[in-house]
Amino acid sequence: MSKMDKLAKFEKFDLFFAAIACICGILKVMEMGKEGYPTLGTVSKNGMAVLAVLVALGFLLKYADQMCRRITSHSFSEKGGFLNPCVILSVIEFFMMLICIKAMLFYPAEIPGVDDSSQMEPPISSKFGLFGAIFMPYIFAECIRLLLANKNSRRDRVILGILVLGCLAMAGLAYLEYKGKGNFISAGILGVGLSMLLSRLALVDEDEEDTLLDDSAEGGNVWMYLAMFASFTLVLILLARSHRILFDNLSFLDSLKSFTFLGRKVSQMASEDPPKDPLPRQEGGGGDTIA
């Protein structure tokens, strides 16, 4: 099997699961918008959980294949080696993928708040939306790649259409979560996805020739590095902000541990350990108590 055949195999894998993600996401939005469909909610939730594992495996295989092809290329050293923007981009994509998988699997769904009768703020919701975790690394990879290789094929337009559907589904989920729970994290991730989508739209041209990743980018182009750095920084700011909200009741060291895949116990501590009561309990009868 040639390298072209292997690459096409990975591309079909990504397209297939991206399409399923859109369908499951739309089902989830429908279930959230119309209460009384527990079966639909169960199907969408379980389907997206299984899909998350498959997508993660697909990303791992894809990036491993890309890195192997670049490192073993005869022109690897001539194009800057590990300082080549495309190689740096692959490392950033891999890092972002791990962070998104970590957020999707290990972050607690909610942090317990005070009782509603206390008229305090409602529980802080930390749901990113499974589609945000699934689509964000894919949008990041595809759109920033276009900043490095100014070539687009018919396949790229198909991917662009899937990204549009994914962003529309993310928009529905983000709106419902913000309206019902005041959750701005999903809206922030949606903003990242839309900004990347606009970058991709600005780079679409009429070239329909199927091409591989363009590794011929010159290492001296400062704009390439600035584009990668700006996008990477924007995503990290959103993740850091949401992480601060989730683990506000933990020590600094425990918060650092929670960033790793070994920090699942720390994440569970954040979701199981309720915050201190803002008001003292009233002992004896004749008054309401804060649970």
Swiss-Prot record:
Keywords (A to Z) from UniProt: Glycoprotein, Membrane, Transmembrane, Transmembrane helix
Protein name as annotated: Uncharacterized membrane protein ECU08_0540
Coiled coil (residue ranges): none
Gene Ontology cellular component terms for the protein in this record: membrane
Bilayer topology: Multi-pass membrane protein
Subcellular location as annotated: Membrane
Glycosylation site positions: N249
Domain of life: Eukaryota
Location, primary (coarse class): membrane
Region annotation (Disordered) ranges: 269-291
Membrane-spanning residues: 13-33, 40-60, 81-101, 128-148, 158-178, 220-240
